[in-house]
Every structure is written in structure tokens, then in C-alpha cells.
Design a protein with these regions (language model features):
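A short, acidic, amphipathic alpha-helical segment used as a generic capping/interface helix at domain edges
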Residues: 73-76, 150-156, 181
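Class I SAM-dependent methyltransferase SAM-binding "motif I" and its flanking Rossmann-like core
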Residues: 88-164
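Short, solvent-exposed coil/turn linker segments
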Residues: 62, 128-131, 181
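Class I S-adenosyl-L-methionine
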Residues: 1-109
Length: 181
């Protein structure tokens, strides 16, 4: 069984009771560090805090692992209980939806444990949630890749009088200066 467990938005203590029970019952635990990071980061001390509270050794799943080697995780989950921890809510990123689809195709059972995400926490801004238009992702540009689709989406939201939630890309392995948004 693959448990995809949302950790919420704060620190290691924001996991739900159901999520903590699932993690403690798993043979293997992965922490996805590609789409987002907990506020405490993932340096060795922060990882040790997670491991101490959860009572499990945690393997960090970076972008390469999530995009290229996640089938290894799914093969493990076919034989034993595996937890895949994600910041926020599991379905806050298409990456995790893809993981569920791939697991189902491989015959791996999946249980999703939801938590708070940026998508429902934006109400703290005081803006009305039902007045948000399409959410946009703003990636890092490279010399070869400079997408501009988010400009049009933002313009459409503005034209309709809607707020826009902007999700900024992060560079987990390159944490200096402006690499984290």
C-alpha cells in the first residue's frame, strides 16, 4: 500500500493524527522535496526532527527520484506499506496525481491522507476565495526556455476581475539568493 500523506504548511507537527498513524505503520518513508519544502527546510537537523517525531528513518525524494525513479517506490509499495510525504495536500501538485495514476496502473493500492495546502490557506490574505481565477505557475527561466503562458492566464483573471494565486518554482538543490520563492 502506498500512503500519500499531506504534511500541511508549517513544520513537522502539522501532520494529521491519521497521517502520523500511517507513517508509523509503514516500512519505508519518503519525503518529497521537489514541489515544495516545509518551513523548517530539509537540512540534516530538520530531517532528524522529522525522523524523531515520526519514529521512522526518512529518505528524501528529490526531483530526479520523483520524475525518473519513482517506479522503485511503487514496486516497494506493492509488497509493503510505504509512505510518501508531501508538503501541503497531496493533490496540490500534478506530480502527486501522476503518482496515484502510475500506482493504479501497476496494481498498487493507494491511500491519500489530506492536509492543509496553499490553495486553501490563501484566505489568510483577506481576499474572498471564490473570487480567485485560474492559479498560475511561474517557473525559473533558462537561456533555452522562457515560457509565457502565465502572462495570458493572469491577464484573463484580471480582465474578469479575479484574483490570481501565483505559485513560484523553487530550486531545492540550489538554495541561495533568489532560488526559493
Amino acid at each position: 500500500m502506498l500512503y500519500i500523506v499531506g504534511l500541511g504548511l508549517g513544520d513537522e507537527r502539522d501532520i494529521t493524527v491519521r497521517g502520523l498513524d500511517a507513517v508509523r505503520g509503514c516500512s519505508k518513508v519518503y519525503m518529497e522535496a521537489y514541489t515544495s519544502l516545509l518551513s523548517l527546510g530539509l537540512d540534516p537537523a530538520a530531517l532528524a526532527n522529522l525522523e524523531k517525531l515520526y519514529g521512522k528513518e526518512i529518505t528524501v525524494a528529490d526531483r530526479e527520484m520523483v520524475e525518473e525513479r519513482v517506479d522503485q517506490v511503487l514496486l516497494e509499495a506493492a509488497d509493503t506499506d510505504v509512505a510518501f510525504l508531501v508538503v501541503g495536500d497531496p493533490f496540490g501538485a500534478t506530480t502527486h496525481t501522476d503518482l496515484v495514476v502510475r500506482a493504479k496502473k501497476m496494481g498498487v493500492q493507494v491511500k491519500v491522507i489530506h492536509n492543509a495546502s496553499v490553495m486553501n490557506a490563501i484566505g489568510v490574505c483577506g481576499l474572498q476565495l471564490f473570487r480567485y481565477g485560474e492559479t498560475i505557475s511561474i517557473p525559473f527561466f533558462t537561456e533555452e526556455w522562457r515560457p509565457d503562458s502565465f502572462y495570458e492566464k493572469n491577464s484573463n483573471n484580471s480582465r474578469l476581475g479575479l484574483h490570481t494565486l501565483c505559485l513560484f518554482d523553487i530550486r531545492v538543490k540550489d538554495q541561495h539568493g533568489n532560488s526559493l520563492a
